[in-house]
Amino acid sequence: MKIGIIVAMDKEFAQLKTLLSDSKTEHRNHKDFVTGTIGGNEVIMQQCGIGKVNSAIGAVEMIDGYHPDLVISTGVAGGADISLNVTEVVVSTECVYHDAYCGEECAFGQILGMPATFATPSEYVEKALSVNDDPGNIHPKILAGQIVSGEWFVDSKEKMRSILDHFPQAMAVDMESCSIAQTCHIYQTPFISFRIISDVPLKDTKAQQYFDFWAKMAEGSFQVTKAFLERL
């Protein structure tokens, strides 16, 4: 398969690039793409930048330039579910915006003319969860659930509670997954998001867990994505 992987931040991109074999860098339309292989799959990686617009542009450039069979959004996210622990991974069953409102004729989070949520193909969710069953598994636990996205770095309990008021089933919150999912929906390209939990706002104060994650725990967090790719 040909797999496109999109991350937002340079810290995430630096870790992901180490997973590639035979890598090389290409420059397209002001963006760098790194190509290589993982588990026999052709892989294209891109750092899109933070937020919905950057990630949508990145997804269009990825799809238009490389025509991947699957697009993966990966990176860190806040845990919406208080049962989650830092370094555990949430794989999307569906993505939705937590900051969109288009009137009473739409569900909260729905863009007019688009689905209320953007579902991940179940076969990819099942493959992701199967990593948990590896003999001698040393990867962080993978859970499946709803990922909500918006233009907000959630660093307070109050903001997290306001999101959960609308989306009580949310498991993780980020700034890119749903915009990439919407782009992939329009371009009819399968999509899945892997989000490594860097902090759980309802168990945190002023994002201290987030900063501790990058200082102490980030190394190796993206190995789960590699294990998933090796199953495709």
Please state what every model-predicted region is.
Residues 1-60, 65-66:
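N-terminal short beta-loop-beta anion/metal-coordinating cradle
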Residues 43-48, 146-148, 194:
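Active-site-proximal beta-strand elements of phosphoester/diester hydrolases
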Residues 61-65, 83-84, 181-190:
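Alpha-helix C-terminal capping segments
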Residues 67-72:
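Proline-aspartate-enriched helix->loop->beta-strand connector
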Residues 80-167:
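Mid-sequence, gly/pro-rich, charge-dense loop/helix-turn segments that line enzyme active sites
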Residues 152-202, 206:
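A C-terminal functional module that forms or caps the active site or interfaces directly
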Residues 201-232:
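His/Asp/Glu-rich mid-to-C-terminal helical/loop segments that flank catalytic regions of hydrolases
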